[in-house]
Each structure stands twice: as C-alpha cells, then as structure tokens.
C-alpha cells in the first residue's frame, strides 16, 4: 500500500506579495525551500490561516534570504500580503518508509526568518 505523507512544511510564513498577472505558482525564498526539503516545481498545498483558503500549486525558487512568499496567478486572488500561510509538501511512500520518515517542519518568525526547524510535530 502506498500512503501520502507529510514530507516538509513551512509553518506560519507571512505572504509578502500576491501577483495576479503572472503565469502561476508560489515563489518561496530558496533558503526556506531547502530547510523544508521542498524542490523547485514540486506540488504544494497552501493553507491561508487568515481566511481558511486552501489551494495547490507548484514552487518556483525566490532569492535566497529574501523572505519572499509570493502567490502568483489565480492563487493571488485567495491571499493578501500579510496573511499567514502554511506551505505543505507531501510524498508517497510505502508503510515501512512512512513509519521511519521524519518530515522537516520549519517554524517561521513574522519577518519570514527561520525560528526553528524540527523533524516532527508533537501535540504533547
């Protein structure tokens, strides 16, 4: 059986731009992409904490250390600069891989600098 599991996540990033007149996608600071294990052109889910919108798109790298989080194209209608978002990448793996895999979870400061990187989430 193949399971779809959390691969990596950028938690509570601040949207810096929304560019309607662009082909599509989300632009993410390359440093943040690497910290979360997210690749160029990878499909991601974006959850807007402010308004509850959920969408899927693909990633293009932004300038390293810029803090850019820019929703492009039609996705720009669903977010506003200043909104907090969660950017989630998933991976398919078998059950043995899923039990061993530890996702990269990147917690953000308000200025889109990295607050903490962990390899798990815990509600304990």
Swiss-Prot record:
GO terms for cellular component: cytosol. The keyword Cytoplasm applies. One of its GO terms (biological process) is pantothenate biosynthetic process. Binds 1 pyruvoyl group covalently per subunit. Gene3D superfamilies: 2.40.40.20. Pfam families: Asp_decarbox. Keywords: Autocatalytic cleavage, Cytoplasm, Decarboxylase, Lyase, Pantothenate biosynthesis, Pyruvate, Schiff base, Zymogen. InterPro entries: Asp_de-COase-like_dom_sf (IPR009010), Asp_decarbox (IPR003190). The active site is at residues 25, 58. It is an enzyme of class 4 (lyase). Pathway: Cofactor biosynthesis; (R)-pantothenate biosynthesis; beta-alanine from L-aspartate: step 1/1. It is found in: Cytoplasm. The modification Pyruvic acid (Ser) is found at residue 25. Its cofactor is pyruvate. One of its GO terms (molecular function) is aspartate 1-decarboxylase activity. Is synthesized initially as an inactive proenzyme, which is activated by self-cleavage at a specific serine bond to produce a beta-subunit with a hydroxyl group at its C-terminus and an alpha-subunit with a pyruvoyl group at its N-terminus. Substrate binds at residues 57, 73-75. Its EC number is 4.1.1.11. Belongs to the PanD family. Heterooctamer of four alpha and four beta subunits. Catalyzes the pyruvoyl-dependent decarboxylation of aspartate to produce beta-alanine. This is Aspartate 1-decarboxylase. It comes from Clostridium beijerinckii (strain ATCC 51743 / NCIMB 8052) (Clostridium acetobutylicum). The gene is panD.
